[in-house]
């Protein structure tokens, strides 16, 4: 809102870019639901094996960075961990993050910023393994309708803190997750007419609090619109490269952002944003390279 009122086109564009970035979570959640359904709907693995396997995959990314954060905290020269947190708070935050329970602290963001995504994703893995793996399509559609109704009612009552709490956890993301499962089971071809309508509704959802509730699913339509371009080189190679870096980016980019923001007053917003983007990719690439060496 402040960006729009400023009338500065540059600030408006940068603010929109920053705001729209969080819709990447919608894409990841959709792909998670789609991939889990393809992988496990008809497999013989037990539900507990699925949950443990997914937890281990997340720990592979989280534990090394956790160790680095602890070393940084006790090095005497803090670089990455937030300075306002005492040593005891660091340990409790680490415990919450590694047990995927940090999302219960909806009143504050813990030190690793987007690490909330891993907790939310793990919740979805558990829900899928225990309840959705063998569920009918009617159950999935019922969940979608139920969550949408809940969020719309809460939003209409002005209970935005509750909406935030649900969006900070798996409940708020269940609709787009269930859509991923449904499309995995029943592939569909969507015409350009419906894609165009979806794109228009997505744009409208940016300005309407009720449409915003379903915006995680509406965000799939702009992706579908540009998907033909993504299948062409060199863009396809770039997207595949970024896809491989996605987990590492989630783990590392909050700490890169902290360092860039500490010095961004001396730089124009465009340069600061470009520097942030390049550093995020480089740090994530190095982090992934180190992990692939050990794993």
Question: What do these predicted ranges mean?
Answer:
Residues 2, 22-26, 109-122, 164-181, ...:
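Membrane-interface micro-motifs in multi-pass membrane enzymes
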Residues 55-74, 144-165:
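Hydrophobic alpha-helical transmembrane segments of integral membrane proteins
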Residues 37-44, 72-80, 135, 139, ...:
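Membrane-interfacial segments
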Residues 30, 34-38, 105, 124-133, ...:
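Hydrophobic transmembrane alpha-helices
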Residues 4-16, 105:
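Membrane-interface segments at the starts/ends of alpha-helical transmembrane spans
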Residues 11, 18-27, 38-79, 83-100, ...:
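Transmembrane alpha-helical segments and their boundary/interface "anchor" motifs
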Residues 150-248, 252-277:
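Alpha-helical transmembrane segments and terminal signal-anchor/GPI-anchor hydrophobic tails
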Residues 95-104, 146-155, 200-201:
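Short aromatic/hydrophobic helix-turn
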């Amino acid at each position: 809102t402040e960006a729009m009122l400023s009338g500065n086109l540059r600030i408006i564009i940068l603010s929109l870019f920053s705001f729209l970035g969080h819709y990447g979570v919608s894409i990841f959640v959709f792909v998670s639901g789609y991939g889990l359904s393809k992988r496990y709907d008809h497999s013989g693995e037990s539900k507990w094996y699925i949950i443990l396997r997914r937890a281990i995959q997340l720990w592979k990314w989280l534990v090394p960075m956790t160790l680095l954060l602890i070393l940084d905290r006790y090095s005497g020269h803090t670089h990455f961990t937030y300075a306002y947190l005492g040593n005891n708070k660091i340990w409790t935050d680490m415990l919450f993050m590694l047990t995927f329970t940090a999302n219960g602290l909806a009143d504050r963001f813990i030190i690793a910023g987007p690490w909330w995504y891993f907790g939310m994703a793990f919740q979805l893995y558990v829900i899928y393994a225990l309840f959705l793996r063998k569920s009918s399509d009617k159950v999935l559609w019922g969940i979608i309708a139920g969550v949408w109704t809940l969020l719309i009612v809460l939003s209409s009552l002005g209970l935005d803190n509750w909406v935030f709490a649900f969006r900070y956890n798996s409940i708020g993301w269940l609709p787009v997750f269930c859509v991923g499962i449904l499309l995995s089971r029943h592939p569909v071809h969507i015409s350009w007419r419906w894609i165009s309508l979806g794109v228009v509704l997505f744009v409208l959802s940016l300005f309407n609090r009720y449409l915003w509730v379903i915006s995680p699913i509406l965000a799939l339509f702009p992706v579908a619109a540009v998907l033909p371009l993504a299948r062409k080189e060199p863009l396809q190679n770039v997207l595949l490269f970024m896809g491989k870096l996605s987990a590492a980016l989630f783990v590392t980019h909050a700490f890169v952002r902290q360092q860039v923001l500490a010095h961004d007053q001396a730089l124009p917003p465009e340069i600061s944003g470009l520097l942030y983007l390049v550093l995020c990719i480089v740090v994530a690439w190095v982090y992934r390279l180190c992990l692939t060496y050990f794993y």
